[in-house]
Amino acid sequence: MTNIRKTHPLMKIINHSLIDLPAPSNISAWWNFGSLLGLCLGIQIITGLFLAMHYTSDTLTAFSSVTHICRDVNYGWIIRYMHANGASMFFICLFLHVGRGIYYGSYTYSETWNIGILLLFTVMATAFMGYVLPWGQMSFWGATVITNLLSAIPYIGTDLVQWIWGGFSVDKATLTRFFAFHFILPFIITALVMVHLLFLHETGSNNPTGIISDADKIPFHPYYTIKDAFGFLLLISLLLTLVLFSPDLLGDPDNYTPANPLNTPPHIKPEWYFLFAYAILRSIPNKLGGVLALILSIAILAAMPLLHTSKQRSMMFRPISQTLFWILVADLLTLTWIGGQPVEHPFIIIGQLASFFYFFLILILMPTSSLIENKLLKW
């Protein structure tokens, strides 16, 4: 009798994705982040669902409903902090996952890569709207500043902002719709993840060498199921350590003050995972230019396959490209630091230089270094 997992229509899908999937024999821990992102998404949906049971999306009660969750709901505090810090874990895994894709040339699977970029934008939008929901000072002013950027769009900008706000300022209508979108988007993300995996399984996984590995494949189960399970254990340990020992480490103290439209906080800044993009936005003195740079800072990933000039796929055997890649990482860390600093000397010029180098590295230096490495291959 044939095994049920190979015949049953539903089990067959699971079998081909998680059990009998042929996987390269040499993929390293950098390939764990896909499954870790799946775990993060699961944690966020489950904790978010339980939070939504007690949360009220009204300007008068939103802040106190979050306080109520933390104080009165059974284990509400851990659910709330798992959700808040789970978002940070989500973005850590996302950045490492994208970084892996750039380093090992995974972007040559263009459909998988493009769906990934779409996922990144969607997750960023979801996180932004989620940050508005507790209705603290930084929630309110963050929402005001970021939505206001749309007014830079010529002709329709002002109308568009008022349409998104549902009025003439960030108010009850804005909070209610943000809650609605924040609730629905994770399910759209889940659907996109399935499409992402569908395209990935069309080609099979890349590997550190960047060489086609069809001749040397191993079954996903048990080799990579156990490896993923170990990754899950590490991620959950890290998340629980953060939640139980310093849950507010990555948050902003201003968000423990209820939203007040009459009092602007001294430094308006987003959560840490948006600081690099925020620094790029602020480095351009023109509003529309800043908005375009902000969008391009992520959208530039779509140009990666076009900018690939090397004869080798992976950076594993390309020391010049490796050096530039790590300079890019250092540049992004610099931008993250600058995004959290006040707009004054010397931070302004550091931010402008770091923003310039971010685009210069990706658009000019990395493709050029690849061409030089191609020449060196002939020596």
Curated annotation (Swiss-Prot):
Residue positions annotated to bind heme b b562 are H83, H182
Q: What is its main location?
A: mitochondrion
Q: Where in the cell is it found?
A: Mitochondrion inner membrane
Per the record, the similarity remark reads: Belongs to the cytochrome b family.
Supply the InterPro entries for this chain: Cyt_b/b6_C, Cyt_b/b6_C_sf, Cyt_b/b6_N, Cytb/b6-like_sf, Cytochrome_b, Cytochrome_b_C_euk/bac, Cytochrome_b_N_euk/bac, Di-haem_cyt_TM
Tell me which residues bind a ubiquinone.
H201
Does this UniProt record's set of keywords contain Transmembrane helix? yes
Protein biosynthesis among keywords: no
Q: Which gene encodes it?
A: MT-CYB
Its cofactor is: heme b
Q: What are the alphabetically sorted keywords of the record?
A: Electron transport, Heme, Iron, Membrane, Metal-binding, Mitochondrion, Mitochondrion inner membrane, Respiratory chain, Transmembrane, Transmembrane helix, Transport, Ubiquinone
What's the name of the protein?
Answer: Cytochrome b
- Which species is listed as the source? Ochotona koslowi (Koslov's pika)
